[in-house]
């Protein structure tokens, strides 16, 4: 999980989710794309 100042979709499989006030990018197929904003 990468922590970045700004998160973007890197592929079509990415899903943007808000949990507990944080923005996450989750990808089950390619887990390298997982990111958290903050």
Swiss-Prot record:
Keywords: Ribonucleoprotein, Ribosomal protein. GO terms for molecular function: structural constituent of ribosome. GO terms for cellular component: ribonucleoprotein complex; ribosome. It holds the Pfam family Ribosomal_L36. GO terms for biological process: translation. InterPro entries: Ribosomal_bL36, Ribosomal_bL36_sp, Ribosomal_LSU_bL36. PROSITE patterns: RIBOSOMAL_L36. Belongs to the bacterial ribosomal protein bL36 family. This is Large ribosomal subunit protein bL36. It comes from Phytoplasma australiense.
């Amino acid at each position: 999980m990468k922590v970045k100042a700004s998160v973007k979709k890197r592929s079509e499989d990415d899903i943007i989710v808000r949990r507990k006030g944080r923005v996450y990018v989750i990808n089950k197929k390619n887990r390298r794309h997982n990111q958290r904003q903050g």
